[in-house]
Amino acid sequence: MILNEIFIKLFFMGMIFVVFSCATIKDEHYALIETKKGKMIVKFFPDIAPKHVESFKALIETDYFNGTTFHRVIPGFVIQGGDPNSKDNDRFNDGMGGHAGKYFGIGDENNSETWTVPAEFNEKPHKRGILSMARSQNPDSGGSQFFICVDNVPQLDNNYTVFGEVISGLEVIDKIVNSSTPGTENPSYRGPDRDNPIEKVEMNISLISSSELDLESLQ
């Protein structure tokens, strides 16, 4: 009788564990970045940069990034994007816009255009494929602009907030960074759009759950 009771308890404990595990897996989200150069899948790091992940997801859920471009591409360094200014035809204002997806105590709570994300510097190295937050000289000025490392760039470690990593589509990074820019066409050019692709590399970003994740179909 006692053995039966123990078995029943263990059985239900196992069921609870399975259900909890499935729910946890189902709730984990990834970012799907789609461009004409290909697709990338990004895994988030909410354990080390919870505010950055929360802000980025909030912006994705409002289609904020759709139609923005990778406006800064530097071989051996990074590709940068996420600025809503890049949706217009003025190349010279790219890299000057964007805001956080949620109010984190910085800026005017009633004006989302002023929202930024406080720094969450961590020990994750800026290696190839890492997703990190762009900012001004103010550490707490992260908004919507982000960059993906093309190569290992240790000089950025502990100076910018790493909050994700490309786990599929690294070759797409290479295609984007090799786009023709005013700087590659004319090395002496020093305009503000020097590293901005001549032919726009637009993106759409959406959230997908782990149950929807199919890495093979993205190759």
Language-model segments: which ranges?
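Cyclophilin-like peptidyl-prolyl cis-trans isomerases
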Residues: F20-Q219
